[in-house]
Regions:
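A helix-coil-helix interface module used to build multimeric assemblies
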Residues: 1-184, 190, 194-200, 209, ...
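Catalytic-core signal marking the mid-to-C-terminal active-site face
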Residues: 1-18, 55, 68, 75, ...
Length: 433
């Protein structure tokens, strides 16, 4: 986890303090149910809660113990015993370290999911506001990076809004799949712990019961979770790259906000660089880097091994914290994005009407010209424009193969033709015109 790219709320989920608090809650809730089942004395369960619920667990002391035990959960339980006293012997009855570690990991990922969903909601709100603001702002659509046909800037943003709606659904599904609890004991047979304990702990921790845990929660769940994060990161990158392209000097249709006092270059005082969206492109790579290791964690040996552990200690906090940061940064960029409709119009006009070539070709075919002949006539005149020899409309009017009346030809260059169905798309995306 890189502090520079983290928010306090997201980082706090992965702090040692939070982790040990969750570990204690799992152990204490298990003790509560065991007391109800008569496995341990009720007085012991009460004492565990009374002495431990407000305790501050000393990470340095736990690390000190672990240097001897070489086992983090045992080190934690030893430290808890120092706080709770004699009743601590009733903790962890019939449980394994994976019961604690995997359930805690599920809690942390679920809580992180809530922040990520909040981040997507902010992105969605920003996109909706800006899309409606520029619903009819004409701009050029590009394919292969080359001018194609007119669109509206609002329509472009509506497409991203639809994509982030899907991102939200993916995160909700990912949370549902990862939010599972396993308190099943060695090799997952419940031989030494009643299944009712697992059900109770799951309920208290806001999780679902893992149907079959083999001492660990199956890692296909985690693979799906991190894959979902990777897709969301790619959606962030797609919009970030779009903004970066639109900010290029020769395009300049949109631009990141540039605050008073901000500097763009240590050498060139004139620079206004798209540093935030460049940063988002890099963060997306970091988040996606978690996907392959998560996939490789699925194939554990038999009922369990710990080859996944070192991986998850890294990708859990890193991927969630960085994605949380990226979503909030992206929302801020959209909210404050400088949009330049006048430059959009200049770029639309730059090729002298070539963006209307398809409409001219279709009009010719409807007037009785074969598609092949219509394509050839339009393309030949378009190539003259590419070479800077004149205006597209003038060439078309002078071409005997173009049999359309001049007033009809001129009408084909109307931008409104390309925006006539914007309302339809907006209703699909936003549920309104």
């Amino acid at each position: 986890m890189i502090t520079r790219y983290s928010r306090p709320d997201a980082a706090a989920i992965w702090s040692q303090e939070t982790k040990y608090k969750i570990w204690f809650e799992i152990e204490a809730h298990a003790a509560t149910k065991m007391a109800e089942l008569g496995v341990i004395p009720q007085a012991a369960a009460d004492a565990i809660w009374a002495k431990g619920k407000d305790a501050t667990f000393d990470a340095d002391r736990i690390d000190e113990i672990e240097r001897t035990t070489k086992h983090d959960v045992i080190a934690f339980l030893t430290h808890v015993a120092e706080i709770v006293g004699e009743e601590a012997r009733f903790l962890h009855q019939g449980m394994t370290s994976s019961d604690v570690l995997d359930t805690c990991f599920a809690v942390q990922l679920a809580r992180s999911s809530d922040l990520l969903i909040e981040g997507v909601d902010r992105v969605l709100a920003a996109l909706e506001t800006r899309a409606k603001e520029h619903k009819y702002t004409p701009t050029v659509g590009r394919s292969h990076g080359i001018h194609a046909e007119p669109v509206t800037f609002g329509l472009k943003l509506a497409g991203y809004h639809a994509e982030f709606q899907r991102a939200k659904r993916r995160l909700i599904t990912a949370k549902e799949e990862i939010a599972t609890c396993a308190i099943s004991g060695a090799v997952g047979t419940f031989a030494n712990v009643d299944p009712a304990v697992e059900a109770y702990v799951a309920e208290q921790m806001g999780l679902q019961v893992e149907p079959v845990s083999t001492q660990v929660i199956p890692r296909d769940r985690h693979a799906a979770f991190f894959a979902a994060l990777g897709v969301v990161a790619s959606s962030i990158e797609r919009l970030a790259v779009e903004i970066r392209h639109l900010q290029r000097t020769e395009v300049l249709e949109a631009e990141e906000f540039f605050d008073k006092g901000q500097k763009g270059s240590s050498a060139m005082p004139h620079k206004r660089n798209p540093i935030l969206t460049e940063n988002l492109t890099g963060l997306a790579r970091l988040v996606r880097s978690a996907v392959t290791p998560a996939m490789e964690n699925v194939a554990l040996w038999h009922e369990r091994d710990i080859s996944h552990s070192s991986v998850e200690r890294g990708i859990g906090p890193d991927a969630t914290i960085h994605l949380d940061f990226a979503l909030q940064r992206l929302a801020g960029v959209i909210e404050r994005l400088n949009v330049y409709p006048e430059n959009m119009q200049k770029n639309l006009d730059r090729l002298g009407g070539l963006v209307h070539s398809q409409r001219v070709m279709l009009a010719l075919t409807q007037a009785g010209v074969s598609r092949e002949a219509a394509y050839a006539a339009v393309q030949e005149n378009a190539m003259k424009v590419w070479r800077g020899e004149g205006a597209f409309l003038d060439f078309l009017k002078a071409d005997d193969r173009v049999t359309l009346p001049h007033d009809q030809l001129e009408a084909l260059f109307d931008l409104g033709y390309h925006t006539k169905n914007v309302d339809v798309v907006f209703r699909r995306v936003f549920g309104e015109g």
